[in-house]
């Protein structure tokens, strides 16, 4: 499956997962023109609608795509929020140019995986920012995949 993000694209495979450009946003996904904010984090259903499955772009790019099924906690890099997710817990804190987002593995596990970003193409996230994206596997289990951006626009899986 793939997500359209601003002028660039973002693709992901849920089984093990990897991110790369290019791709397109399928009709099954929700396309948003603004980054998710804590006020839109609604825990009204197990899907956590409108929350995190985000294409992280440079600060000038404000369009993000969300995958309803694999959404977890909404927490963009410039905000602070925390709380229970039902499948575990997650928290994230803004640290300016060292911002970090932590996401639950989703199955009750307390473990986390992190993504270490370099500065290539991510000017607002260039000082050691770390992100983790949960993947929903066909087996019904959650798996967290970590990625590292590479100069030249491709994303490769980062072994945690």
UniProtKB/Swiss-Prot annotation:
Is the keyword Repeat assigned to this protein? yes
UniProt superkingdom? Eukaryota
**Is the keyword NAD assigned to this protein?**
no
Tell me which UniProt keywords the record has, alphabetically.
Keratin, Repeat
One Pfam entry for this protein is: PMG
**Which Gene Ontology cellular-component terms appear in the entry?**
cytosol; intermediate filament
Residue span of region 4 X 10 AA approximate repeats: 41-86
What family classification does the UniProt entry report for this protein?
Answer: Belongs to the PMG family.
According to the record's subunit comment, the protein's assembly and interactions are: Interacts with hair keratins.
Q: What does this protein do?
A: In the hair cortex, hair keratin intermediate filaments are embedded in an interfilamentous matrix, consisting of hair keratin-associated proteins (KRTAP), which are essential for the formation of a rigid and resistant hair shaft through their extensive disulfide bond cross-linking with abundant cysteine residues of hair keratins. The matrix proteins include the high-sulfur and high-glycine-tyrosine keratins.
Its name, as the record gives it, is Keratin-associated protein 13-4
Tell me the organism. Answer: Hylobates lar (Lar gibbon)
Give the gene symbol. Answer: KRTAP13-4
